[in-house]
Amino acid sequence: MSSSCFCKHSEETPLSVLSPELQEQFSDPNHPANLICELCRLFYDNNWVTGTGGGISIRDVDGANPNLVYIAPSGVQKERIQPWEMFLVELPEEKILRTPNDIPKELTKSYKYKPSACTPLFMSCYTMRDAGACIHTHSQHAVMVTLFLEGKKEFEISHIEQIKALPKLALNENTGKIEKIGSMEYYDKLVIPIIENTPHEEDLTDSLQEAIKNYPGTSAVLVRRHGIYVWGETVWKAKVYNEAIDYLLELAVKMQQSGIPTVKQ
């Protein structure tokens, strides 16, 4: 049986120990902290964030301060995460405004929370692409693709209907920003850069930034033998892009096993 998506805490936890402001936030199912809970449960059911792996962050693009970023902590079981367990960071200085360790112990049970090791990579997506959300999964399909492309720097696939779910991006010469100009077409070739894994997650930052810079048309970066980072202009766009890319990665694995090229000649 799959787990419930929404963070059902109203009858199980004493939210009265929180400030009125936080009580209001955590009672709103559309608040970024609750959306992270919802998506973590969904991604867990898809085997993308098992064993405390992976991570997600959401920028409050629809809130009073769109520079606020909510980030799931490191080393927690994603399917059990609660909204008060998020780190709150403000862009562009990347200042930490609140941590789960600031929350009353009645809720956190004195657990010592650590910031996500993905934080500098998430911040790169926000500052370089003005993303509204960034998702990091340990998808087996992502890992498998990087294994059969050992030594290659790119994943490519074309002429698959699902490609239409992904954005077509281009550099705006006036603003200097990468902007969405439409959606990819059936005949377009999707190219996702692959970077090499490192012993520590934060050490991936430079490689990820270089890939984002060198591939202006991408909404994702694969990490060999590790997983994938996907971002989008809103949390729901990032979710769609992640799902579409994972579908294409799974299909690519099966095509490889059947001797079918992923790019139609």
From Swiss-Prot:
* List of residues binding substrate: C118
Q: Which residues bind Zn(2+)?
A: H136, H138, H226
**Which keywords does this chain's UniProt record carry?**
Amino-acid biosynthesis, Cytoplasm, Lyase, Metal-binding, Methionine biosynthesis, Zinc
Active site, renumbered:
E161 (proton donor/acceptor)
Family according to the record: Belongs to the aldolase class II family. MtnB subfamily.
Lineage: superkingdom: Eukaryota
User: Does Cytoplasm appear among the keywords?
Assistant: yes
SUPFAM superfamilies given for it?
Answer: AraD/HMP-PK domain-like (SSF53639)
Biological process terms in GO annotation: L-methionine salvage from methylthioadenosine
Pathway-wise, it operates in: Amino-acid biosynthesis; L-methionine biosynthesis via salvage pathway; L-methionine from S-methyl-5-thio-alpha-D-ribose 1-phosphate: step 2/6
Q: What is the species of this protein?
A: Scheffersomyces stipitis (strain ATCC 58785 / CBS 6054 / NBRC 10063 / NRRL Y-11545) (Yeast)
Q: Which GO terms describe its cellular component?
A: cytoplasm
Which molecular-function annotations from GO does this UniProt entry contain?
methylthioribulose 1-phosphate dehydratase activity; zinc ion binding
Q: What is this protein for, i.e. what is its function?
A: Catalyzes the dehydration of methylthioribulose-1-phosphate (MTRu-1-P) into 2,3-diketo-5-methylthiopentyl-1-phosphate (DK-MTP-1-P).
Q: What class of enzyme is it?
A: lyase
- Cofactor note, please? Binds 1 zinc ion per subunit.
Q: What is its EC number?
A: 4.2.1.109
Which HAMAP family does this entry report, sorted A to Z? Salvage_MtnB_euk
Identify which cofactors the protein needs according to its UniProt entry.
Answer: Zn(2+)
Catalysis: reaction(s): 5-(methylsulfanyl)-D-ribulose 1-phosphate = 5-methylsulfanyl-2,3-dioxopentyl phosphate + H2O
Q: Where in the cell is it found?
A: Cytoplasm
What is an example of a Pfam family matching this protein? Answer: Aldolase_II
The protein, known as: Methylthioribulose-1-phosphate dehydratase
